[in-house]
From Swiss-Prot:
Catalytic reactions on record: RX + glutathione = an S-substituted glutathione + a halide anion + H(+)
Family the entry assigns: Belongs to the GST superfamily. Theta family.
A GO BP entry: glutathione metabolic process
Name of the protein in its database record: Glutathione S-transferase 1, isoform A
Record's function text: Conjugation of reduced glutathione to a wide number of exogenous and endogenous hydrophobic electrophiles.
This protein's UniProt keywords: Transferase
Cellular component, GO, one term: extracellular region
The protein's Enzyme Commission number: 2.5.1.18
The organism of origin for this protein: Anopheles gambiae
Domain GST C-terminal: 92-186
Record domain GST N-terminal: where: 1-81
Amino acid sequence: MDFYYLPGSAPCRAVQMTAAAVGVELNLKLTDLMKGEHMKPEFLKLNPQHCIPTLVDEDGFVLWESRAIQIYLVEKYCAHDPALAERLYPGDPRRRAVVHQRLFFDVAILYQRFAEYYYPQIFGKKVAGDPDRLRSMEQALEFLNTFLEGERFVAGGDDPTIADFSILACILDCNVRRCRVRSAAI
């Protein structure tokens, strides 16, 4: 399956971690946003929202939004291994709800605040980050630390879930950019 991605993208890395966990090989299609490759007509035909990551399955099914892709990969490619599916994306409604909550926390709070603080510096050539946005991002990291109190993984349990992959990818970006993550166990 084709996977349109950018190596430095946390959402793309989360999908790559999920694909590796379920044993799916991705045909990597580097998509250079700085060159506008995501705005070319052939890409827009696949994904009118012109975002990455974008997955094109063997049968032509197209999906974007990293967390949706993660869920799809587990549901489709773990059918042969229910135990693996259960570890990555639990079937129990309460455990799955916590995984969803952590995924939504990542997309709406953690990664969003990371992007609000760092993207102006990365893409806008702004040298210094906005102190208010830094405080907001640090607050999101404190929420994450609260989730991890007494836990090995962000959604609890004994095994990492797709929520861990998603949040880990964001935290790796934070670490590269020298954010302060004190007690995160992932």
